[in-house]
Regions:
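Helicase motor core with emphasis on the C-terminal RecA-like subdomain
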Residues: 1-25, 35-95, 99, 103-410, ...
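Intrinsically disordered, low-complexity segments enriched in proline/serine/threonine
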Residues: 12, 25-27, 49, 206, ...
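Short cysteine clusters
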Residues: 711-720
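Extended Lys/Arg-rich polyanion-binding regions
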Residues: 358-360, 366-384, 391, 401-413, ...
Length: 752
């Protein structure tokens, strides 16, 4: 799109002029202040280390006099860091290092900060949800620290997929919208990209899988639910992606495949290599996997091989989604909808960057949202990319950020507006909790520990776990804390560059997961249980039963209903508020790597994890369900199926994917006393997703109903009401009941 050139021209020009002794002026648009010396330093911030490394390669290739560019991230050797602080004038870093190293140790960076003229935020659209809220506060902290050194840098936000650049960027850096100028003309030289939407075929009958891998034991069959056994299943996007990538590599088409998880990436790469070995020996080594958790050396080597053409096919997570400049890619496969139109366009844009025509294929996963999208291409191409949703005032985000800001410099009363309207109340609470100390001139951090350690920017729940080979003690890789319980539990299969391991043990205290090398023919998926408790109700909307509904027990005309509900809730009520979610991994399932066949389930209880977050929930009078045609027997399955489908379709109207959400349904909830469906944000403090559903409920539920009605299955399948995350093995489920209930809910809302 030409966005890189738009910030490189002014920043490199300033660096060159400063190196020649010429006067440099970079007046800030939002304050009128300017730097007081003639240095020209640039701080480039990207959400991924791979993107920073790519930009550094491009910068050094310019051989510009006076340019001293360097990466400063977790992979930077300790011996090089002091030189970078004292001599580099174009530093490429990540939000993590800005928090843990630069701002918290800003006195060591005084020389660089005094000459800081430009801050570049690459891929600015990626700062959404809780991550975006952290980045917004991090940038406010950066502006505070810059003010200590009497510098007011110009901020550049670069994004090729932003629907509201002025609004989102002004909110991100904390300035008025009138201070932001949008440059929206694309100047890139691109060929034509053909985009195909591919819905895989249904798999052969279950007997085919059993013949292929041998019959399972009766006990194993019994563990899998009846619904899952009988439901038709499509070929998985991983299997379909491996088949397509094999064909592309055989035709020497340089290709990139995006998959949704680390395990999927490894399996896809493994399958492709096996298929290639069956057809043309010697090609399998030109296919690899790329994801977080590899060592820095492994990542850099893979990036090098992809650029120079040694690799013909690469399976990647979102780690390669961002604007890494890889010329010569001819095809991109997207194995499963990535969650947002912005993310999809980013992935499609990886191909054809050298001006040649390109191919992009979305391979639909077997779930309601993917099914909806392949049959409604206008939902992808007929509208702008999603708004970037984040809330800088989220108290779970802002509280640790305020502690870090107070350590960098005491927070003065006149600065409170910088962090939002709830800052004073949060500061008082932090004083009461002993984190801060209030003095006449402001709020102080008085502890010996670094306050920056309280800030969990990526919501990973603490530092990463080291994956250690139990046989020789070598470091295999790392795993973030957010995935440790579900992917690092004993018995889990872990794949690293086609080498397979089984987890022997997990130590929370030592942050170590011990692995043993194995050669299994299955992969694992965790089984989880969930409990939701209501803490605070922030809003509610009440609806009556649909006109003409047959409500058992409803009073006759002229009679009044007895007041039996303590809360006086309506027949249908939609709520929004704060909830506490307790998740626990209780075991895991095994699936065949060949056809995805279910092989059995093992118990493996892990410590529970507690999440305080935001949710939307629906409560029903029992008579409302009867009036909608839902029998008492179908009640649990109706609520369960409606919950699954609603979670699957909410990402259609909010910047998220279904893995950013969780849910629970019950015929009698302990806090509401009635049938209840919960949909909650799977992030501490919330991410604004459920609130978007609350505010656009008719659009949300209409899409959910359409997805169910348009699915050709009889009793429910992954394309409509099954969920890959379900801890109850997708049982009970009533597709017909969910359809009837959603029809009644939409009628109630239309009549309100």
């Amino acid at each position: 799109s030409g966005k890189t050139l738009s910030y490189l021209m002014p920043t490199l020009d300033a660096i060159y002029r400063a190196s020649c002794g010429e006067p440099v002026s970079s007046t800030s648009a939002y304050s009128g202040a300017e730097n007081l010396n003639n240095r020209a330093n640039v701080l480039y911030i990207s959400p991924a280390k791979a993107l920073s490394a790519d930009q550094l390669t491009a910068l050094t290739s310019y051989n510009l006099p006076g340019l001293h560019a360097a990466s400063y991230d977790g992979d930077t050797p300790t011996g090089e860091r002091r030189w970078i602080r004292e001599h580099a004038n174009f530093i490429l870093t990540t939000p993590d290092m800005l928090n843990y190293s630069i701002l918290s140790n800003h006195r060591q960076w005084a020389s660089f900060l005094r000459g800081l003229r430009y801050v570049v935020l690459d891929e600015a659209h990626s700062y959404r949800g809780v991550f975006g809220a952290h980045i917004a506060n991090l940038l406010r902290r950066l502006r505070r620290v810059c003010a200590l050194y009497r510098t007011v840098p110009v901020f550049y936000g670069a994004s090729a997929t932003s629907s509201n650049p002025v609004e989102s960027f002004s909110k991100l850096i904390g300035v008025p919208q009138q201070a932001v100028t949008a440059i929206t003309e694309s100047t890139s030289a691109r060929g034509e990209t053909t985009v195909a939407l591919w819905e895989p075929e249904f798999m052969p009958p279950k007997a085919h899988d059993q013949l292929a891998k041998g019959a399972r034991s009766t006990q194993q069959q019994a563990v899998q639910s009846k619904a899952e056994q009988e439901a038709p299943r499509r070929v998985s996007p991983v299997e379909q992606g491996a088949q397509m990538l094999t064909d592309l590599v055989l035709s020497r088409t340089r290709s990139l495949v995006f998959a949704g998880s680390r395990r999927s990436v490894e399996i896809l790469s493994q399958k492709t290599q096996r298929y290639l070995d069956e057809v043309e020996a010697g090609l399998s080594h030109r296919v690899a996997a790329y994801r977080a958790g590899y060592t820095p050396e492994e990542r850099r080597e893979l990036e090098r091989k992809l650029r120079n053409g040694e690799l013909l096919g690469l399976a990647s997570t979102s780690a390669l989604e961002l604007g890494i400049d890889i010329s010569g890619l001819d095809a991109v496969l997207v194995a499963g909808w990535p969650g947002t139109r912005a993310s999809f366009m980013q992935r499609v844009g990886r191909a054809g960057r050298s001006g040649q025509d390109a191919l992009a294929v979305l391979i639909a996963d077997d779930n309601p949202l993917d099914t909806y999208l392949v049959h409604h291409p206008e939902a992808i191409f007929g509208q702008e990319v999603e708004a970037t949703v984040f809330d800088p005032t989220n108290p779970y985000v802002l509280s640790p950020q305020l502690c870090a800001a107070a350590q960098e410099a005491p927070i003065r009363a006149e600065e409170l507006s910088l962090f939002g309207p709830h800052t004073a109340a949060l500061l008082d609470r932090l004083v009461q909790q002993g984190y801060l100390r209030r003095r006449p001139d402001g709020w102080y951090w008085t502890h010996a520990e670094s306050a920056a350690d309280l800030v969990d920017i990526r919501g990973t729940g603490g530092g990463p776990y080291q994956l250690i080979d139990a046989e020789d003690g070598t470091l295999v890789g790392t795993m973030d804390a957010a995935h440790a319980m579900s992917q690092g539990h004993p018995g889990a299969i872990y794949i690293h560059q086609n080498a397979q391991y089984v987890v022997e043990s997990l130590s929370e205290g030592e942050r170590v997961i011990l692995l043993s090398r194995v050669y299994p023919d299955y992969y694992t998926r965790a089984v989880e249980s969930t409990e939701v408790r209501i803490l605070v109700e922030r809003a509610r909307v009440s609806y009556s039963a649909p006109a003409g509904a047959a409500i058992p027990g409803e009073p006759a005309p002229g009679e009044s209903a007895p007041e039996t509900d303590a809360q006086q809730l309506a027949p249908l009520t939609m709520h929004r508020g704060q909830v506490q979610v307790t998740d626990q991994v209780t075991g895991y399932r095994r699936f065949s790597v060949y056809g995805g066949e279910y092989l059995g389930e093992e118990e493996q209880p892990m410590p529970p994890e507690v999440l305080m977050t935001e949710a939307v929930w629906f409560t029903f009078e029992p008579s409302y369900l009867f009036g909608a045609g839902v029998t008492e027997e179908d009640g649990p399955g109706t609520l369960h199926a409606a919950e699954h489908a609603a979670i699957g379709l909410l990402p259609l109207i909010a910047t998220s994917d279904r893995w950013d959400l969780g849910g629970l349904s019950t015929l009698l909830h302990v806090d509401t006393g009635r049938p209840t469906i919960f949909v909650y944000d799977a992030a501490p403090g919330g991410a604004g997703i459920s609130e978007r559903g609350f505010n656009a409920v008719a659009q949300w539920l209409s899409a959910t109903l359409e997805a169910i009605e348009s699915c050709g299955c009889e009793n429910g399948c992954p394309s409509c009401v099954h969920s890959p995350k379900c801890g109850n093995r997708n049982e009970p489920l009533s597709k017909h009941g969910a359809r009837a209930l959603l029809q009644a809910m939409l009628q109630s809302m239309a009549e309100a």
